[in-house]
Amino acid sequence: MTVLTVVLGTPFLFGDHPVRWEAGSKLPTLVLDDAPESTAPADTTDVKASPSPTADPLKVAEPWKKGMPQWGVQLYWEEEKTKRSDAFIEKQAEKHAKYLIGLGANSVSVSFPFYIESRTSNVLSEGAKTPSPARVERVLKVFKDAGFRTTLRPIMDEGSLKQANGWRGNIEPDSRSAWFASYKKLVTPYLKVADEAKTNTFVIGTELNSLEGDVGWGPLVSSAEKSFSGEVSYDANWDNYVRGRISMPVNHLGVDAYFPVKVADTASVGTLAKGWNDWLDRKATGKLPNILIAESGIGAMKGAYHAPGDFYARRTVNEKVQANWYTAVCQVVQERQMQGVYWWSIHFDDDPNTAPDDKTASRLDFAGRPLTEKAIKTCFSSDYAGPGTDDSTS
């Protein structure tokens, strides 16, 4: 087991989606509808995510190998009130696999919720929306059989954290030892099925800022490695990447990256990339081969650059904003020789081939938005070879 110390930056999630923090703020703030309106003409090119020319539409054309970039998507899975059959979830996973192959993805991360009663609670549990270990295994096997690099990632749901500043990153259990014991009991069955499904990575924690560096992680990770033979990782929040150290006893550290860039909707891809690099440079300049963008995205709406992960706002749709952001992030990943990027997100029960209903859907949804799909396909089909396999940078 290797102990890595890295500073990582990302957004946190309210419920099952990311919500942004303004730099230096203790509370999440919504971006007001005050950004200059884009005057750029709308690009109406109809670009669908079509399968790559492979012999089998359910097979990744070039499966991931160590040293290659991870080009992926975060698939968020909440069980519906009316539980779907095992046959349904396998068919649904196949539908997503086919769509992701059409985008050129070689990786997928399956995220799912678990629950806490309050900010100070020591008890963690499954809920009605938590898929069972057996059902998770079925879905992971569909993606593995299709040739994807697979990740399993439990995320603490924040629905019970009603305080004004309540989020997973500032929980304070009354007894940390009891909290870790409860968490071990919760995740162990998922570690075992992840191992059975030959999953590449298990994310042992996501955005748990207040618990990072706690002595409880050592025994938990040691236990996890007895049940799971793949990589054990941790995904940290974006602001930590630039302002603090994270010491976690894991194989790898990822970052959920939603760096705010204070520019107009008409900003060029180069300007957006510079905004990202300015944030990254606060930690380190040059190549970042140890860093994986475990989660990134932005709303397809005006003013989104100011708060990329704002799930709740539904300002005027501007797909160009989202597409240009994706292009800029991909450019930075390649220029800094990072490990790859996973886009947030697609909901498991959604049809990725259907455009989102902008009256109700999150602006962060990208599936079914032609310009963004085109940007993803261009990113995933680039000639970027990846960070390489040097042990010092893998």
Regions found by a protein language model. Name each.
Residues 6, 11, 15-41, 46-67, ...:
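Aromatic-rich peripheral "rim/lid" segments of glycoside hydrolase catalytic domains that contact
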Residues 81-87, 114-133, 158-179, 302-314, ...:
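Surface-exposed, active-site-proximal loop segments in enzymatic domains
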Residues 84-100, 180-193, 237-246, 323-331:
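Short, acidic/polar
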Residues 85-102, 124-145:
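Aromatic- and glycine-enriched glycan-recognition loops and surfaces
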Residues 100, 108, 202, 253, ...:
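Conserved, mostly hydrophobic/aromatic
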Residues 103-122, 134-211, 346-349:
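Substrate-binding cleft and catalytic face of glycoside hydrolase catalytic domains
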Residues 132-133, 138, 146-149, 153, ...:
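Glycoside hydrolase catalytic-domain groove-lining segments
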Residues 186, 201, 211-235:
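Active-site neighborhood of glycoside hydrolase catalytic domains
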